[in-house]
Regions:
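Amphipathic terminal alpha-helices
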Residues: 3-4, 13, 25, 319-343
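Conserved C-terminal active-site "lid" loop/helix of NAD(P)H-dependent oxidoreductases
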Residues: 45, 232, 256, 290-314
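Mid/C-terminal beta-alpha module of Rossmann-like enzyme folds, strongest
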Residues: 202, 245-292, 304
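NAD(P)-dependent short-chain dehydrogenase/reductase
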Residues: 142-144, 167-243, 262-267, 271-277
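Non-catalytic, hydrophobic alpha-helical segments
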Residues: 235, 239, 259, 270, ...
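Core catalytic loop region at the nicotinamide-binding pocket of NAD(P)H-dependent oxidoreductases
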Residues: 213-218, 242-259, 334-341
């Protein structure tokens, strides 16, 4: 019998790429969880398959609505859950801290509690990927590579919410034997990356300038950060491989893993790389105070040793290729008439 995979956050960048990966590389039946009001711009290419029920379907539910999550698990019983849904924008979390905490912590608890109850009732035993974030490490010391034992130091309401999510994944694994594993992904990007994130807003603005829709000035926030970057498609491959090992019982319940790129950049270097792909050579950069966070994680470098000891994985897509694909994504969106907001 074919396995069923549930993807929460199906319409987001990571969720939509996860659906693509599973449909192309497995025989899984895929269930995409989404809210009624969500945009499907990242999943338009799957609509025909969804309409034909060709190995993919949609289930409407909301992380904050326990009854809809309960109905989802009672009726579908997925074999593997990739829990990717979240309020995932650190800067936005300063504006809506309560909603961020509610969605990310209580929403995750709603999923795990439903699984716990079904496991106690009739031995329901799925694999559960709980997506945390490298933001849990917050303001790390310069020169230190972050590993899974590095203390948490939340630097935004978002990062604090992900600390809670991380602990929930570990607790439900250790206390109830649910096959949870937690991932702390470093900065990831590529096609479909939301423009609220640094490299994507830079790429979007370049595409707008090339199309004559914006003056040749890129507006940015903090430029002092040093980050590793990886292509989201590399991260998704790691998620899938970890889920296979978890299903075999080779990943301890509640285990956490860093997943990060191995190419580090200062943010001005990211701008220079993207500008190098542009057809315009007159673009200037201007700092915008409205884009600054109250506090930021300025330095993040990672140690991937642990995950490599569990699965045969390493980042394969070069960061420069990822940045070029991101810029081309925005060029394509603008050509289609999908003019984004200035943010």
């Amino acid at each position: 019998m074919k396995k069923t995979a549930l993807i929460t956050g199906f319409t987001g960048q990571v969720g939509s790429q996860m659906a693509d990966f599973l449909l192309e590389n497995t025989d899984y039946e895929v269930i995409g969880m989404m809210r009624w009001q969500e945009s499907m711009e990242n999943t338009y290419h799957l609509n025909d398959r969804i309409n034909k029920k060709d190995r993919i379907s949609i289930f409407y539910a909301d992380l904050n609505d326990y009854s809809s999550i309960q109905k989802l698990f009672e009726t579908k019983r997925p074999d593997v859950i990739f829990h990717l849904a979240a309020q995932s924008y650190p800067k936005t979390s300063f504006d809506i801290p309560i909603e961020t905490l509610q969605t990310n912590i209580i929403g995750t608890a709603n999923i795990l509690e439903n699984i716990r109850l079904l496991k106690a009732k009739d031995d329901y035993d799925p694999v559960v990927h709980v997506c945390s974030s490298s933001e849990v490490y917050g303001r790390a010391k310069v020169g230190i590579k972050l590993n899974e034992e590095t203390p948490f130091h939340g630097a935004s309401p978002y990062s604090i919410s992900k600390i809670g999510t991380d602990y929930l994944g570990r607790f439900y694994g250790e206390a109830y034997g649910i096959k949870t594993f937690i991932t702390r992904m470093g900065t990831h990007s590529g096609p479909r990356r939301s423009d609220v994130f640094f490299e994507s807003t830079v790429a979007k603005q370049i595409a707008l300038i090339e199309a004559g829709l914006q003056d040749p000035i890129i507006k940015v926030g903090n430029l002092s950060s040093v980050r590793t970057f990886q292509d989201v498609r590399d991260a998704i491959r790691a998620y899938y491989l970890l889920s296979l090992e978890s299903a075999k019982g080779k990943v301890p319940c509640g285990e956490a893993f860093n997943i990060a790129g191995e190419e580090a950049f200062k943010l001005p270097e990211v701008i220079d790389i993207l500008l190098g792909f542009s057809t315009r050579k007159d673009i200037k950069v201007e700092q915008d105070k409205e884009r600054l966070r109250a506090i930021d994680a300025d330095y993040q470098m990672f140690d991937n040793t642990k995950i490599k000891s569990y699965i045969n994985w390493k980042p394969e897509i070069p960061a420069r290729k990822m940045f070029e694909d991101l810029l081309n994504h925005w060029r394509d969106e603008i050509k289609k008439g999908n003019i984004p907001l200035n943010r």
